[in-house]
């Protein structure tokens, strides 16, 4: 195989690997490129490589995606092979047979590869809305914010980070694994989200402190040289939290991703941001970064209007260069930096 062909094959394999590990929509896979490769060669070796990068990947074996998803993926892979080659590939049918007999649980796993070679694995609900909340799955803006964070580790290095509406935990876990924060506080308000969030923190190898009080009592060992940040998960209801409760966190950086669902959440979020602006003992306001997908321009406009009325200046963060995670490429997303 010529060097250019090897490079093309490697890109194709990476495309399948990243999308399958993250359980992205099948329509987003590079099927057309695969069909071209299959027409130009016997294809058996390439398909076996794809199997090893997807359903046979060590991460998927240990933390499997949805059975339904694996079944659909393998069925599509077999269709592409059969459309070009009449000779069946036993390994494909064997892999499909294994998932056809498996039960599909209510939870599945998604994994995201980091530039360091490490990965973030999340256990998520198989339903977009489960237990009355959308916080049990990872949304596009969380991936977008995590990508930006990985490119800008200095924003978080050796600092205390508070994330509002952490959901499944993707953004925070990526930051904890790549940006060396001093401490990271995941927060949400829904009991099922908090339970899943704690599980994902542990799943990714972090110890979980019981509360912020343990940090206040024993901050010493968590020095900038520490390899692992101090991590906790906190229940934080934007509508009822008080300024003294927020002051206990003493954040240097505040984050939120995909939390602009409706006008009510916008008003609640701005209320929390106003309280956070005066929460630090040294009177230095934390840096704040809010990422969102532009689903409803009116809701986004309401957010910036409310920020203005609250006296919180903002600026849009320039788009980052590197796309690390697979998400909807046609989604319009933005990150605002707020001056609290």
UniProtKB/Swiss-Prot annotation:
Key word Methyltransferase present: yes
GO biological process per UniProt: peptidyl-lysine trimethylation
Cellular location(s): Cytoplasm
Enzyme category, top tier: transferase
GO molecular function: protein-lysine N-methyltransferase activity
Keywords noted in UniProt: Acetylation, Cytoplasm, Methyltransferase, S-adenosyl-L-methionine, Transferase
InterPro entries: FAM86_N, Methyltransf_16, SAM-dependent_MTases_sf
Entry EC no(s): 2.1.1.-
Reaction(s) catalysed by this chain's protein: L-lysyl-[protein] + 3 S-adenosyl-L-methionine = N(6),N(6),N(6)-trimethyl-L-lysyl-[protein] + 3 S-adenosyl-L-homocysteine + 3 H(+)
Any GO CC annotation of this UniProt entry: protein-containing complex
Subunit structure as annotated in this protein's UniProt entry: Interacts with FAM86B2 and FAM86C1P.
Described function: Catalyzes the trimethylation of eukaryotic elongation factor 2 (EEF2) on 'Lys-525'.
Name listed for the protein in its UniProt record: Protein-lysine N-methyltransferase EEF2KMT
């Amino acid at each position: 195989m010529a060097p250019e062909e090897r490079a093309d094959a490697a890109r194709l394999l990476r495309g399948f690997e990243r999308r399958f590990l993250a359980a992205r929509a099948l329509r987003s896979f590079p099927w057309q490129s695969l069909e071209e490769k299959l027409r130009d060669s016997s294809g058996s070796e390439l398909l076996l490589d794809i199997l090893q990068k997807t359903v046979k990947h060590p991460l998927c074996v240990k933390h499997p995606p949805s059975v339904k998803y694996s079944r659909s993926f393998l069925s599509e892979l077999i269709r592409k092979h059969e459309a070009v080659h009449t000779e069946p590939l036993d390994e494909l049918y064997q892999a499909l047979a294994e998932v056809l007999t498996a039960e599909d649980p209510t939870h599945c796993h998604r994994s995201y590869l980091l530039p360091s070679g490490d990965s973030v694995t999340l256990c998520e609900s198989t339903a977009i809305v489960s237990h009355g909340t959308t916080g049990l799955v990872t949304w596009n803006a969380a991936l977008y914010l995590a990508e930006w964070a990985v490119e800008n580790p200095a924003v978080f290095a050796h600092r205390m980070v508070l994330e509002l509406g952490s959901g499944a935990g993707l953004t925070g876990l990526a930051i904890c694994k790549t940006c060396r924060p001093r401490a990271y506080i995941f927060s949400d308000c829904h009991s099922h989200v908090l339970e899943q969030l704690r599980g994902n923190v542990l799943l990714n190898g972090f110890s979980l402190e019981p509360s912020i009080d343990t940090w206040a009592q024993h901050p010493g060992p968590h020095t900038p040289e520490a390899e692992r940040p101090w991590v906790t998960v906190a229940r934080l209801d934007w509508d009822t939290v008080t300024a003294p409760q927020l002051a206990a966190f003493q954040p240097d950086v505040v984050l939120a991703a995909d939390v602009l669902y409706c006008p009510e959440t916008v008003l609640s979020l701005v209320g929390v941001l106003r309280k956070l602006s005066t929460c630090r003992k040294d009177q230095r306001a934390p840096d704040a970064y809010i990422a969102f997908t532009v689903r409803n321009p009116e809701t986004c406009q309401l957010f910036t209007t409310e920020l203005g009325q609250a006296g919180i200046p903002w600026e849009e963060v320039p788009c980052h260069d590197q796309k690390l995670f697979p998400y909807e490429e046609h989604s319009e997303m933005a990150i605002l930096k707020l001056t609290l």
